[in-house]
């Protein structure tokens, strides 16, 4: 324990040496297992969960907060998460989220609620008193959870209106209503209430490649994603920046997700982070100006910087069409980390019954056409380091092949589902799609074998959180879904 504490102290010193403030992240509720055993009757409910509303639990947290800053007096503040409490690598601790999942909303509540408003209020007030007021340190309270604090304005206000503002108290809110998916709306809890807000942005999205291929989200965050531009304002940060409670952004520059793909080059994550960070420093700058500056910093001249930024912008168009949809409601969880799900996550019967088959298939083809344009740009680029240029090209190839696999897999599952409903299968189309699909997987593996800088590859299986540490469910996923129709296509 002393060794870890000393490492943290050195890290805080290193952060300060760079002219930055040091804010450490912690989950609530997590307590030493031995302490819980001693005080179980005073801090746990009838189900054995630690109850933050109990006086002894709050007393323990007040003592803990005081001791943290006594041990690390130069620590500038804490980032508090209450929505996900994971205990995977801390065997001597125990914990749970503070909001009881079985709580029911009262009849006086007219909005979606998990009943946790009072708990959030009490916890925020405790943190405010112990850290912001008594110690003059900062608290960043994240609204992210599995309830409705981070998505429902009425819930948000019913918590925050009962917590006095303080110069050291910030509320952190994801820019999207929910997790970091395309097609999710801009967060309606941004820009409301009295408390200063810091907007959270993920630069390495686990649902969209984790940097294995171009995925430029900075433009969409700042100016509005294509799918949001007919929404009521604000739908982007440039429409929020003049709000007096907007206090800035913080990026998840890396991280997100549970497994791969694992990247060897941070280029695409770095691009998102750089553009957002420079904009946060000067919100008068445009996304385009900053993107070109990034490219010039990588050694590209004016023409090549323009090309690079065009490639980046096109990636957002390709991804929303290839992985999500502007036409129908597609389950945004069908790919995550290194896994590709299949019919178990996608409602092909619904697509068919809504009459969207041809439009959806055309949309997937449009995604591939955009990826081809991106490849053309990538291979025309000049004027940067050889290593960077090689990664731009191979990562764009990676995206092109992967999304081509998505497209052919989608075609097979769609045509297979049509056959399931009608009893008549389009064998010719299925056979052609399988030939393309099988070749694409070989091309994908060849790309990785010939380009060591490529990220690790996706797998045609489903993600399952119960299957640690691989999280790989081989009984479900793209392979199982298409193989069902492989037998039909080649046995007739």
Label every PLM stretch briefly.
Residues 168-257, 263, 365:
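Active-site core of glycosidic bond-cleaving carbohydrate-active enzymes
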Residues 478-482:
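Intrinsically disordered terminal tails
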Residues 244-468, 472, 477, 490-492:
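C-terminal non-catalytic alpha-helical accessory regions
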Residues 15, 22-24, 64-68, 182-186, ...:
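Noncatalytic linker/hinge segments flanking ATPase motor cores
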Residues 1-178, 208-210, 253-281, 314-317, ...:
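Aromatic-lined carbohydrate-binding surfaces of glycoside hydrolases
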Residues 483-491:
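Tryptophan-rich aromatic "cage" segments
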């Amino acid at each position: 324990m002393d060794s870890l504490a000393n490492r943290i102290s050195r890290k805080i010193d290193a952060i300060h040496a760079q002219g930055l403030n040091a804010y450490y992240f912690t989950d609530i509720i997590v307590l030493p297992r031995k302490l819980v055993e001693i005080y179980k009757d005073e801090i746990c409910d009838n189900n054995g969960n630690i109850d933050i509303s109990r006086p002894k639990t709050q007393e323990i947290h007040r003592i803990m907060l005081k001791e943290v800053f006594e041990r690390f007096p130069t620590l500038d503040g804490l980032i508090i998460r209450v929505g996900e409490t994971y205990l995977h690598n801390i065997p001597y601790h125990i914990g749970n989220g503070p909001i009881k999942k079985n709580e029911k909303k009262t009849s006086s509540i007219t909005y979606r609620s998990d009943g946790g408003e009072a708990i959030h209020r009490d916890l925020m007030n405790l943190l405010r008193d112990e850290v912001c007021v008594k110690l003059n340190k900062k608290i960043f309270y994240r609204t992210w959870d599995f309830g409705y604090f981070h998505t429902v304005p009425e819930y948000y206000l019913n918590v925050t209106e009962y917590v006095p503002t303080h110069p050291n108290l910030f509320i952190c809110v994801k820019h999207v209503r929910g997790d970091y998916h395309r097609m999710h709306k801009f967060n309606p809890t941004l820009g409301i209430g009295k408390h200063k807000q810091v907007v959270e942005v993920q630069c390495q999205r686990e649902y969209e490649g984790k940097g294995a291929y171009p995925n430029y989200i900075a433009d969409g965050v700042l100016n509005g994603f294509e799918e949001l531009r007919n929404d009521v304002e604000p739908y982007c940060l440039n429409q929020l920046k003049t709000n007096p409670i907007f206090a800035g952004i913080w990026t998840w520059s890396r991280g997100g997700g549970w497994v791969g793909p694992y990247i060897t080059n941070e280029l695409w994550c770095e691009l998102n982070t750089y553009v957002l960070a420079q904009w946060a420093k000067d919100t008068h700058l445009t996304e385009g100006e900053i993107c070109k500056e990034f490219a010039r910093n990588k050694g590209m001249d004016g023409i090549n910087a323009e090309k690079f930024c065009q490639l980046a912008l096109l990636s957002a168009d390709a991804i929303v069409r290839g992985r999500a949809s502007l036409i129908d409601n597609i389950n945004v969880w069908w790919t995550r980390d290194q896994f590709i799900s299949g019919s178990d996550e996608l409602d092909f019967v619904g697509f068919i019954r809504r009459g969207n088959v041809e439009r959806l298939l055309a949309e997937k083809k449009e995604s591939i056409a955009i990826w081809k344009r991106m490849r053309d740009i990538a291979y025309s680029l000049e004027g940067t380091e050889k290593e960077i240029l090689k990664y731009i090209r191979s990562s764009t190839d990676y995206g092109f092949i992967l999304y081509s696999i998505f497209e052919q897999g989608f075609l097979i599952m769609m045509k297979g589902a049509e056959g399931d409903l009608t009893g008549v299968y389009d064998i010719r189309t299925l056979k052609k799609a399988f030939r393309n699909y099988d070749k694409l997987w070989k091309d994908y593996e060849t790309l990785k074998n010939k380009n060591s800088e490529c990220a690790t590859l996706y797998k045609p299986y489903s993600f399952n959180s119960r299957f640690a540490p691989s999280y790989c469910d081989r009984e479900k996923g793209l392979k199982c879904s298409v193989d069902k129709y492989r037998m039909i296509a080649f046995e007739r």
